Amino acid sequence: MNVKEHVISLPRRVFVGHDIIYDISIYFSQLGITSPFLIVTGTKYTKKIADKVIENLPKDAKYEVIEIDTATLDDVYKVEEVVKKVNPNILLGIGGGKVIDVTKYAAFRNNLEFVSIPTSPSHDGITSPFASIKGLQKPVSVKAKEPLAIIADIEILSLSPRRLINAGIGDTIGKIIAVRDWRLAAKLRGEYYGDYTASLALMSAKHAFQCTKIINKDIKYGVRMLIEALISSGVAMGMAGSTRPASGSEHLFAHAVELLHPEGVLHGELVGLGTIIMAYLHGINWKIIRDRLKKIGFPVKAKDLGLSDEEVIKALTIAHTIRPERYTILGDRGLTWSSAEKIARVTKIID
């Protein structure tokens, strides 16, 4: 398939290491980043990390802080109100997935650069030029701004709740399915397929898979491996110009569940469940994926996440409608109720 123009959006610099948050003013100097800054952060643990960042900014730096709890369009508007007031040179997103998504979308809408400073390795939005914002037409990722730089402090990331770390592993292993779906769409629909970006996404998944062997023994080494996999996955999306290499039928299932059960479940947890199910459909060894996830304490049953059997089955039957333009193993018609129930039981997602 011939593509007239292919735009690649990538970060300019990625900093990964231990206690590197204390060197933030050095990194900003290297990149020519100057105040005023608008710092977007959370209200609890992430606010404490933001305070550390503020302590290590250049002494004469001017900044404003806004705290958010969710990733909705209203949160984006709140950030934009402060943007108009402060007129910042750059936005700093210090937090988990929700904070970084709001920051990058606000940066995109206001033609500003932003720096991604993750406090948990929960999903690949750390790097990607796409954001998941509630309040838009559908629960899928929209075009946003790629980070100018990423500052990933392993000491900070290793202290994040284990549930968030596991969610990041689930999100990244899902790339195995995303790439299979992409290949299928290229073969059956003539969709553009990028070998290099697909390989990069698969490498991220393999790293996350390897991480399941390490994380229980050495949390810091495991988290470093995971954060590098998440960054690589985000880069793959930037190179592809879409979420295709990182989001397939496993994500469609996750988004479908989020419509039916919007609170209390992490995105990466749902992607992990979706990966097990879609691996079965693709003829991939789903049992190995399930066993590896289970060993790290990942919830591999719907009831572990407070989901009912009916919610899982319903999600499987509507998943293909979430992004009808994105062809996957689910096809155009999706799954019948009986097929969905059978698959969910065979893969032990429901009893």
Swiss-Prot record:
Catalyzes the NAD(P)H-dependent reduction of dihydroxyacetonephosphate (DHAP or glycerone phosphate) to glycerol 1-phosphate (G1P). The G1P thus generated is used as the glycerophosphate backbone of phospholipids in the cellular membranes of Archaea. InterPro entries: G1P_dehydrogenase_arc, G1PDH, Glycerol_DH. Binds 1 zinc ion per subunit. Its main location: cytoplasm. HAMAP family: G1P_dehydrogenase_A. NAD(+) binds at residues 97-101, 119-122, 128. Zn(2+) binds at residues 171, 251, 267. It is found in: Cytoplasm. NCBIfam families: PRK00843.1. Keywords: Cytoplasm, Lipid biosynthesis, Lipid metabolism, Metal-binding, NAD, NADP, Oxidoreductase, Phospholipid biosynthesis, Phospholipid metabolism, Zinc. It is an enzyme of class 1 (oxidoreductase). Pathway: Membrane lipid metabolism; glycerophospholipid metabolism. Pfam families: Fe-ADH_2 (PF13685). Its cofactor is Zn(2+). GO terms for cellular component: cytoplasm. This is Glycerol-1-phosphate dehydrogenase [NAD(P)+]. One of its GO terms (molecular function) is metal ion binding. The keyword Transmembrane does not apply. It comes from Saccharolobus islandicus (strain M.14.25 / Kamchatka #1). Its EC number is 1.1.1.261.
